[in-house]
Amino acid sequence: MRADWVAKRQGQSNVSQMHYARQGVITEEMDYVAKRENLPVDLIRDEVARGRMIIPANINHTNLEPMCIGIASKCKVNANIGASPNSSEINEELAKLQQAVKYGADTVMDLSTGGGNLDEIRTAIIKASPVPIGTVPIYQALESVHGNMENLTANDFLHIIEKHAQQGVDYMTIHAGILIEHLPLVKNRITGIVSRGGGILARWMLHHHKQNPLYTHFDDIIEIFKRYDVSFSLGDSLRPGCTHDASDEAQLAELKTLGQLTRRAWEHDVQVMVEGPGHVPMDQIEFNVKKQMEECSEAPFYVLGPLVTDIAPGYDHITSAIGAAMAGWYGTAMLCYVTPKEHLGLPDAEDVRNGLIAYKIAAHAADIARHRPGARDRDDELSHARYNFDWEKQFELSLDPERAREYHDETLPADIYKTAEFCSMCGPKFCPMQTKVDADALTELEKYLASTAAKEELAKA
């Protein structure tokens, strides 16, 4: 779809959506996004120019259906997939991608760290994906030196980053905010550093006693991103890995650096969103969102969860969806899903489904709470269908129609029950929604109540 659009931009030194927006240009991607969001296209352009919204759209990802991430638009959900050294291959990752797109992922991140040829896996995912693809290039950089972290150089990082950009990656997690002076700040934590990328860079800095090469070469990364319109997803290497560590000095020190890097990228018209925690108690979520907006000049916030408790392995799609709904309500632009396998193992396609549905619920709940235009229309339509016992319509409007139908049909599978005015919970005699009160009856009741009230007033007099 985008091949003709991007062909007109060939040869330009900066092809970012922010660059065009700041020139007053409305790109085809902006127009497409405005229609998807049901928002004025001028608003889309202005929000992108301001940096409060990004449209992740690498010029080499031509089969992309453009979308946006920002506080003015609907709350978005990302799904993580990716092969590990111990599990998965290309076909399994493509199945996860298909599952993620089917159940409404707005973006997908390929977090492959092994399982075969990483370039082959990534290019297959990009070719098959209509949604933006994000990556964490430091994983492949480490693989390129056979896991010997101390052998990594700045050129290794830049080479892999440019390769991902050439292949069509729309946004990349760049862990440029963790600095050597931040490392002593984690000494009082329970879980230390839980970011894989952050952990790699921390070990590199401790080994070499040198500053983070992604920080010192940040301007070189900006130049790559300008040429392909790759968006920064500034990684939070020092995010808390448990509720005890939330909002601590290490996390907030890195956040301040991320704000500085955000504004540095904006000076070159490169799009930025900022990643956030993690594990955060419910009473600290509002603070975290507002602090990010303050430090990062309202760049879109992209949070992992956050998990609001640490005691539910196997159910962390629930512990985190609670925090995600709250974060979305307070203004987070995109939620990174957590699956039931979090902290336990590599998710499969069914885990992707369960995690994604939990997060679609959280994002939708946030949209309703923020009174985004049309957010509740689907809820109202489903409620009407429920009251009218229109089972097929209820299934159709559900976030997961297959699961809704499956649960209904476990006990009442026959077609006749698709028109029945009850389900197996209440049966035919106890369903309260069978109590249909017509308008005439309510009018008569109102007259009676008014008359009774008047008589009582007279009696008091």
From Swiss-Prot:
Substrate binds at residues 80, 109, 139, 175, 195-197, 236-239, 275, 302. [4Fe-4S] cluster binds at residues 423, 426, 431. Its cofactor is [4Fe-4S] cluster. It comes from the Bacteria. GO terms for cellular component: cytosol. GO terms for biological process: thiamine biosynthetic process; thiamine diphosphate biosynthetic process. It catalyses: 5-amino-1-(5-phospho-beta-D-ribosyl)imidazole + S-adenosyl-L-methionine = 4-amino-2-methyl-5-(phosphooxymethyl)pyrimidine + CO + 5'-deoxyadenosine + formate + L-methionine + 3 H(+). InterPro entries: ThiC, ThiC/Bza_core_dom, ThiC/BzaA/B. This is Phosphomethylpyrimidine synthase. It comes from Picosynechococcus sp. (strain ATCC 27264 / PCC 7002 / PR-6) (Agmenellum quadruplicatum). The lineage of its organism: Bacteria, Bacillati, Cyanobacteriota, Cyanophyceae, Oscillatoriophycideae.
